[in-house]
């Protein structure tokens, strides 16, 4: 069913396809990615995080990962002032997507421009839930004090 949904033959389902066509679970008004790990021999799917039997998953569409990241970091800098440093924890599945898109150099330049340092993770915990395909971080700004 997933292969038909995304228009890709089962034999061609791989990490790149899984990253480009994620599934998500809806909780209240928010969607949380449920990243596919592999296609099993019986054609069922295994996920990187818990997916209970009977849970409804929604097909999601991705946007430009770099455009979205640049906008988010710019918004944070608008609120905090220029970032001194941001410690970023980026899901390894995002890294795979960037590599597949051939945009590693552009991603590195964007992260340097916004003073981001960090590492790749295997997802994050949020409110007790394991989520994937996300970037979390701590931004430390350097807002100037006003003189009195």
Regions found by a protein language model. Name each.
Residues 1-114, 121-148:
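Small-residue-enriched flexible segments
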